[in-house]
Design a protein with these regions (language model features):
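Bacterial Sec-dependent N-terminal signal peptides
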Residues: 1-29, 208-212
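Repeated loop/turn-to-beta-strand initiation elements of outer-membrane beta-barrel proteins
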Residues: 24, 63-67, 177-182
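A short, acidic, flexible beta-alpha connecting loop/helix-capping segment that sits on the rim
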Residues: 185-189
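Outer membrane beta-barrel transmembrane domains
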Residues: 160-165, 170, 174, 179-183, ...
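Gram-negative (and chloroplast) outer-membrane scaffold detector with strong preference
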Residues: 28-30, 56-139, 204-212
Length: 212
C-alpha cells in the first residue's frame, strides 16, 4: 500500500515539474463481477452484472505518458436460486444481492497516435473502492406458496468489509472526442474480517466516455 502511494506521488510530481496537459472525461459502462468465497473447504462463486458512471481527469506530459484519477459510481446485482422437494412438497429459494460502490481509480497510462484522429493507450493501477450499500433479499416457496424474508443490510454484520483495493489495467482508444476502453481489476483484500471466510472479487469493465 505504501509503495503504491509513493509511486503515485512520485509520478505526479514528475508531471507537475514538466509541461503537463490535462483532460477531463465523463463516461458510463458495463460491469461484470465475480465474487469468490472460501469457507473452510467449501468454495463458491457469485457472478453479478451492472454498470458504472463517473468522471476522470488525466494529466499527461504530451509525449505519451500520463496519470489519471477518477470517481465512479458502480451498481451490481446478482441472483442465485435453487429448487428441491421434501416428502413430495416442492421447495424453492432465491437470493438477490444488490451492491453500490464509490470507486476511485488511479492509473498510469501510455498512449501512441495511430493517425491524426486515433490514439491507442494502455493503463494500469489501483482502484480504491468503498461500499455504499449492500443488501440481500430472500424469496422462497413451499408447496406453491410464496414467501419473502425482506432485505438484509449486509454491512450490519461487522465481519463484512466495505473497503477494497483492486489492481488491474486495460486497453482503449480515443477517436476524436470519443473514448472506448476495456479493463480488468482483481481484488486484493478479503471482504470478510473473519479468518474463517475469505472473499475476493474480480471485475471486468467495458465502457464509453466523452473527452473534454
Amino acid at each position: 500500500m505504501k509503495r503504491i502511494v509513493k509511486t503515485i506521488i512520485a509520478a505526479s510530481l514528475m508531471l507537475v515539474s514538466t509541461q503537463a496537459f490535462a483532460q477531463l472525461s465523463v463516461g458510463v459502462g458495463y460491469l461484470n463481477s465475480t465474487s469468490k468465497t472460501k469457507a473452510g473447504d467449501v468454495v463458491s462463486t457469485l457472478p453479478s452484472n451492472g454498470f458504472y458512471a463517473g468522471a476522470e481527469y488525466n494529466i499527461s506530459d504530451g509525449k505519451g505518458f500520463g496519470i489519471s484519477a477518477g470517481a465512479y459510481y458502480s451498481y451490481l446485482i446478482a441472483a442465485k436460486s435453487g429448487n428441491g422437494s421434501i416428502a413430495g412438497i416442492n421447495l424453492g429459494g432465491k437470493a438477490t444481492v444488490e451492491e453500490m460502490y464509490l470507486d476511485i481509480p488511479v492509473n498510469f497510462n501510455l498512449s501512441a497516435k495511430v493517425n491524426s484522429s486515433l490514439r491507442a493507450f494502455l493503463f494500469a493501477g489501483p482502484t480504491f473502492s468503498v461500499g455504499l450499500s449492500s443488501t440481500t433479499k430472500g424469496e422462497g416457496s413451499i408447496g406453491g406458496i410464496n414467501l419473502e424474508t425482506g432485505k438484509h443490510d449486509n454491512y450490519s454484520d461487522d465481519d463484512y468489509n466495505r473497503f477494497d483495493i483492486l489492481l488491474g489495467g486495460g486497453i482503449g482508444i480515443d477517436y476524436g472526442s470519443l473514448r472506448l476502453k476495456v479493463g480488468y481489476n482483481a481484488g486484493m483484500l478479503n471482504r470478510y474480517k473473519s479468518d474463517n471466510v475469505i472473499q475476493k472479487r474480480n471485475v471486468l469493465s467495458a465502457g464509453i466516455a466523452f473527452l473534454f
